[in-house]
Amino acid sequence: MDRRTFFGAATIACLGSPFVVRAQKAKEARRIGMLSAGTLSTSEPGPFYEAMRELGWIEGENLIIERRGAAGKSEAVPALAAELVRVHPDLIWTDGAVAGIAAKNATTTIPIVAISGDPVRLGLVSSMSHPGGNITGWSTIAPELAVKRLEILRELIPSATRVGEIVDRANRYWYEVKKDYERAFASLKLQPHFVEITVADAIPGAITEIANGRADALIVRGDPMFGSNREQIARLALQHALPTIAEGRRMPEAGQLLSYGAVGGAAARRIASIVDRILRGAKPGDIPIEQPTEFELVINPKTAKALALTIPQSLQLRAEVLKG
């Protein structure tokens, strides 16, 4: 066999080997970064990953995901954002205001899909319809939602007068909307008890402070810090006999009393669609910020029973009551 024949055969053999096939797949794969002030699980599939799979993006095949979560330490997020930028992802997905702002400060060129409150008030984008720059995403803000949760609380506990709420001090969006929240409480003759914290380790003390302040209920915000610690919050609130009113269905699924917010599966599909469009060449600045249009009320009856609360028929008729 001459040299040309040998190297030709060797090349064909190598191209057909599983090692080269895997290398080709890795070369073709797109890389996305995920950034959160909370915890990003690799073991929990979730509706976002399912939606991505339906769109043809499968982690480990044509998609590489770089996850960076601060585990409730919001001050660590900027460094994690810089770390993500250094691996040169095709896109960065951010969860919450803290992560969105950190990613914006870290890069002006890598596309960012930000899940946040009002991205205009946060300074992430110039407008909802024409974001411009390298950022688009999903706004969890719907002006009526905060009031709606308080209305549900009033329906559930007509005698309630004082309500606790834990706030992540690093979440700049909170300070943008604080006056709106205070007006919402006042409109229903409720007195808020806000407790600001900077790390997840402070959650137990914050709940104790709210309980000692004779609160009738606890509002649980949708910030990543609280989502990542939802089971702990459920357990501690129950120990203090505090009914919890939360933002997303994973909260009552973790043992909290109830939630009212965007339908999780629908939101995940829309966010995955935005990611898909960018991975296929769309410019983030040309993609309007999307907002939820479908909402759900979810109740955990086991928690209601443990709190000796009777859920009014009016709420039961509007809610999905979890089994068990």
Regions found by a protein language model. Give the residues of each.
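Short hydrophobic alpha-helices and adjacent helix-cap/hinge residues
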Residues: 1-324
